[in-house]
Amino acid sequence: MQKLIILLLVAAVLMSTQALFQEKRPKEKIDLLSKRKTDAEKQQKRYCSDDSQPCSHFYDCCKWSCNNGYCP
């Protein structure tokens, strides 16, 4: 009987720790996605070379046209 109680306690502890780890993982994924989004926004705000000429080819947003010196 004592072995059964100990086994149930161990199972409960394992399940609770697993639930804690599962709660932390989605937050990390969301943080990574938001970081990627802000990095992309920074690249889009990169200054372009000249309004009258096509932008430099270093950034895709500047390949085709400039908008007041900034990526459109």
Swiss-Prot record:
Compartments it resides in: Secreted
Positions of disulphide bridges: C48-C62, C55-C66, C61-C71
GO CC entries: extracellular region
Native species: Conus victoriae (Queen Victoria cone)
Family recorded in the similarity comment: Belongs to the conotoxin O2 superfamily.
Domain remark from Swiss-Prot or TrEMBL: The presence of a 'disulfide through disulfide knot' structurally defines this protein as a knottin.
Tissue distribution of the protein: Expressed by the venom duct.
InterPro entries: Conotoxin
Cleavable signal peptide: 1-19
Keywords: Cleavage on pair of basic residues, Disulfide bond, Ion channel impairing toxin, Knottin, Secreted, Signal, Toxin
Name listed for the protein in its UniProt record: Conotoxin Vc6.16
GO molecular function: ion channel inhibitor activity; toxin activity
Function: Inhibits voltage-gated ion channels.
Main location: secreted
Propeptide feature: residues: 20-44
